[in-house]
């Protein structure tokens, strides 16, 4: 264990000088003697000086303070002791419930599983949300991204998925809150507690008020905990909210480290940093990690480098649209933009595939007719097109659904719709079996039977 002294402090970046024969390795954790603050080595500058990023506030720090090298990367507790606990980036508890009791600690920097260790899966994961199960089904052991701009419902969708999957799924879950609001973290904790699934969830938070070092590493902390459960042979759920903040923390750190920015001011190592995280979120022959990640889309621009880099790593993309949210249709999932690799007749079966494609074709045709309707009005359409518009509007409304986690806002009880009921409902609408019902009957209901019942009340 060598010791050095602080020579320069620029915000979250701290330069430390060590004896030349005892320079720490990149990613080694250093400990500041006075405050107990942890620093992570990012660069070796030469002449015994290393540039580090602080895992906490550098307020009140001064030059000359002694820093000890721990000789190892940051390690965090892993195992059953993490379940039901709220921890920070270093694995320290923040829930006032005593120390986290685990037998092992793992380094947060680990190699991704090798090619021959990985295992693919085509098994579907039912979410109980109609639009997702029908048009962008999730694979067990797959990676899913929830893309959306500010205020279109990423976190609410994420919480509904956690509620539906974590309650139905008997395994363990890990939630990494990366650079999000403390209020949302608090809401999520109480939601889990009220649902009695807190004892199966490990929570790791690095909120948006934390220094960039915390926000950059907190996703790796959560992932390390999930990897331990996977390597034990379990099926783990990994939730990350929000991947964009991980990228943003990387941008802040990159600028502080003096790297030249690339497109739109992002770090030049954007693709590599994203790859380091995403390549580790994978299923092996021992167990699986199914990950659901919220991705903020700056200014609703899906071609921005951050969301564009994330797209390449995902099996399914759920795109939330502001135009659909403006219509009052929640979840505001864009049925034409959202995609999944699972949407293949060999994986999901012909009935599901044909229904999904028929729904998308109807909605696409309606989208094309909207210009004609806006200029000439509905009366100028042919009878066939009028029928398509009527069915498309019913489909659009039937894609909405009341959420369990939104009960407190809407007063409407949440609905979980099985895949079988979802396919049956959309098949019937596309086939014209419900052409006689008003479109309002399909808004904010669960199954098609509820829509028929609602139509009876509307008459």
Swiss-Prot record:
UniProt-annotated location(s): Cell inner membrane
Catalysed reactions, semicolon-separated: ATP + H2O + 4 H(+)(in) = ADP + phosphate + 5 H(+)(out)
Record-listed ATP binding positions: 148-155
Listed EC numbers: 7.1.2.2
Summary of subunit composition and partner proteins: F-type ATPases have 2 components, CF(1) - the catalytic core - and CF(0) - the membrane proton channel. CF(1) has five subunits: alpha(3), beta(3), gamma(1), delta(1), epsilon(1). CF(0) has three main subunits: a(1), b(2) and c(9-12). The alpha and beta chains form an alternating ring which encloses part of the gamma chain. CF(1) is attached to CF(0) by a central stalk formed by the gamma and epsilon chains, while a peripheral stalk is formed by the delta and b chains.
Job description of the protein: Produces ATP from ADP in the presence of a proton gradient across the membrane. The catalytic sites are hosted primarily by the beta subunits.
Protein name in the entry: ATP synthase subunit beta
One GO cellular component term noted in the UniProt record for this chain: plasma membrane
Pfam families: ATP-synt_ab, ATP-synt_ab_N, ATP-synt_VA_C
Alphabetical UniProt keywords: ATP synthesis, ATP-binding, Cell inner membrane, Cell membrane, CF(1), Hydrogen ion transport, Ion transport, Membrane, Nucleotide-binding, Translocase, Transport
EC class of the enzyme, as a word: translocase
Membrane topology: Peripheral membrane protein
Gene Ontology MF: a single term: proton-transporting ATP synthase activity, rotational mechanism
Gene name linked to the record: atpD
Phylogenetic classification of the source organism: Bacteria, Pseudomonadati, Pseudomonadota, Gammaproteobacteria, Chromatiales
Family: Belongs to the ATPase alpha/beta chains family.
């Amino acid at each position: 264990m060598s010791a050095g002294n602080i020579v320069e402090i620029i915000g979250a970046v701290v330069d430390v000088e060590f004896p030349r024969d005892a320079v720490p390795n990149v990613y080694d954790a250093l400990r500041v003697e006075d405050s107990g603050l942890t620093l992570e080595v990012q660069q070796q500058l030469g002449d015994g000086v290393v540039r580090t990023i602080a895992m906490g506030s550098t307020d009140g720090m001064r030059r000359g303070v002694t820093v000890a090298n721990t000789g190892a990367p940051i390690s965090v507790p892993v195992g059953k002791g993490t379940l039901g606990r709220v921890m920070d980036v270093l694995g320290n508890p923040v829930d006032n419930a005593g120390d986290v009791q685990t037998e092992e600690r793992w380094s947060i920097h680990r190699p991704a599983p090798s090619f021959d260790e990985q295992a693919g899966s085509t098994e579907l994961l039912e979410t109980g949300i109609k639009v997702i199960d029908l048009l962008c089904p999730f694979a067990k052991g797959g990676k899913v991204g929830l893309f959306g701009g500010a205020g279109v419902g990423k976190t609410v969708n994420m919480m509904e998925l956690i509620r539906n999957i974590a309650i139905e799924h008997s395994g363990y879950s890990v939630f990494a809150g990366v650079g999000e609001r403390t209020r949302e973290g608090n809401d999520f904790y109480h939601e889990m507690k009220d649902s009695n699934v807190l004892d199966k969830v490990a929570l790791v938070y690095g909120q948006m008020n934390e220094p960039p070092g915390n926000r950059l590493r907190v996703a790796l902390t959560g992932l390390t905990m999930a990897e331990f459960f996977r390597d034990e042979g379990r099926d783990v759920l990994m939730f990350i909210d929000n991947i964009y903040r991980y990228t943003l923390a990387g941008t802040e750190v990159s600028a502080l480290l003096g790297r030249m920015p690339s497109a739109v001011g992002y770090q030049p190592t954007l693709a590599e940093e994203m790859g380091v995280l995403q390549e580790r979120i994978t299923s092996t022959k021992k167990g699986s990690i199914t990950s659901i990640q919220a991705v903020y889309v700056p200014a609703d621009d899906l071609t921005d480098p951050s969301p564009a880099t994330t797209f390449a790593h995902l099996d399914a993309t759920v795109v939330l649209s502001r135009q659909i949210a403006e219509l009052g249709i929640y979840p505001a999932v864009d049925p034409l933009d959202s995609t999944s690799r699972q949407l293949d007749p060999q994986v999901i079966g012909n009935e599901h595939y044909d229904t999904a494609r028929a729904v998308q074709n109807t909605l696409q045709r309606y989208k094309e007719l909207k210009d004609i309707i806006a200029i000439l009005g509905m009366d100028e359409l042919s009878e066939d097109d009028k029928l398509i518009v009527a069915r498309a509007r019913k489909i659009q409304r039937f894609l909405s659904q009341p959420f369990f986690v939104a009960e407190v806002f809407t007063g409407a009880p949440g609905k979980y719709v099985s895949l079988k009921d979802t396919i049956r409902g959309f098949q019937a609408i596309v086939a014209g079996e419900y052409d006689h019902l008003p479109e309002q009957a399909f808004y904010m209901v669960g199954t098609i039977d509820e829509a028929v019942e609602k139509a009876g009340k509307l008459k």
